């Protein structure tokens, strides 16, 4: 097998979104090949080498920022000058990415407690709404409506998120939602360790999520796969939505194409630690 540049490997396997990002990670000393640290982007490695990105020196407080980074690269969405909401904030990777890209305020909502990074807790632009179930959030709980939002939640379906987003968002709001097959598919379709591998189930879940969006005045205007897999190796999807009066479905056959591309790219890709 012919060898490949390390920075190129990281891009091709969905660990980063650009060669520039790959080079930065490699030079920072957190990329390991077969358990050995490699700090040269041009290092030639075997395609079947064990490659790991260790630590959190990825430009954001958590890898969630990489998901929103990709969404902003492939969809026409920007948080510049907008009031935003990070639904399922956890450590705050999405919040961090929003702030780095010009958000004027971010409501960081999470049912958990004590997870948000200290740098974000102490940022005047961040409204820390921890211990808050998004299903209970009402327009009167916010100082103003939300124009840009992200959703990255676990153990809850998007079915319960879109009605809230419909109520709290501006008429022209945009958002990106992580569609996670492991939390949307029926229990009988979820495999060992909560992993859903069947492309047919992925297509079914995305079609259902599309319906949830449209039923709550959101047009699913774009679809791609997350650049990194979930903790147990689940492939997850980025659905770009636009708030509107007359929702339209995704272009025909887009779901099938994106699911196929996601498996081609990520089935054998290492996880980002």
Q: Which residues fall in each region the model found?
A:
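Conserved S-adenosyl-L-methionine
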Residues: 97-105
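Conserved class I S-adenosyl-L-methionine
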Residues: 80-90
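A short glycine-rich, Lys/Arg-flanked "PGG" loop and its adjoining helix->strand segment in the class I
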Residues: 159-176
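A basic, amphipathic helix-loop patch mediating RNA/tRNA/ribosome contacts
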Residues: 1-49, 83-84
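Short, glycine-/aromatic-enriched active-site segment of Class I SAM-dependent methyltransferases
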Residues: 181-198
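Glycine-rich SAM-binding Motif I of class I
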Residues: 92-93, 114
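S-adenosyl-L-methionine
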Residues: 107-160
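Flexible, glycine-/basic-rich loop-and-beta segments that form/coincide
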Residues: 235-273
């Amino acid at each position: 097998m012919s060898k490949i540049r390390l920075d190129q490997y990281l891009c091709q396997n969905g660990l980063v979104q650009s060669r520039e990002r790959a080079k930065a990670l490699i030079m920072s000393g957190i990329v390991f090949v077969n358990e050995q640290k490699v700090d040269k982007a041009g290092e030639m490695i075997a395609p079947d080498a064990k490659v790991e990105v260790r630590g959190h020196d990825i430009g954001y407080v958590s890898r969630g920022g990489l998901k929103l980074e990709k969404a902003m690269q492939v969809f026409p969405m920007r948080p510049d000058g907008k009031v935003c909401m990070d639904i399922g904030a956890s450590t705050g990777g999405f919040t961090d990415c929003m702030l780095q890209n010009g958000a004027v305020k971010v409501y960081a909502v999470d049912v958990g407690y004590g997870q948000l990074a200290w740098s974000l807790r102490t940022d005047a632009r961040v409204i820390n709404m921890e211990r808050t179930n998004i299903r209970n959030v009402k327009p009167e709980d916010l100082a103003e409506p939300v124009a840009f939002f992200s959703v990255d939640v676990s153990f809850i379906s998007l079915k319960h998120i879109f009605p809230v987003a419909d109520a709290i968002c501006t008429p022209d709001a945009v958002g990106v939602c992580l569609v996670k097959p492991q939390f949307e598919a029926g229990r009988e379709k979820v495999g060992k360790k909560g992993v859903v591998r069947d492309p047919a189930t992925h297509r079914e879940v995305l079609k259902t999520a599309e319906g949830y969006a449209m039923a709550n005045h959101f047009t699913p205007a774009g679809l791609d796969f997350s650049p990194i897999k979930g903790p147990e190796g689940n492939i997850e999807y980025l659905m770009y939505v636009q708030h509107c009066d007359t929702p339209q479905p995704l272009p025909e056959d887009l779901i099938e194409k994106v699911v196929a591309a996601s498996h081609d790219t990520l089935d054998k890709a290492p996880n980002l630690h």
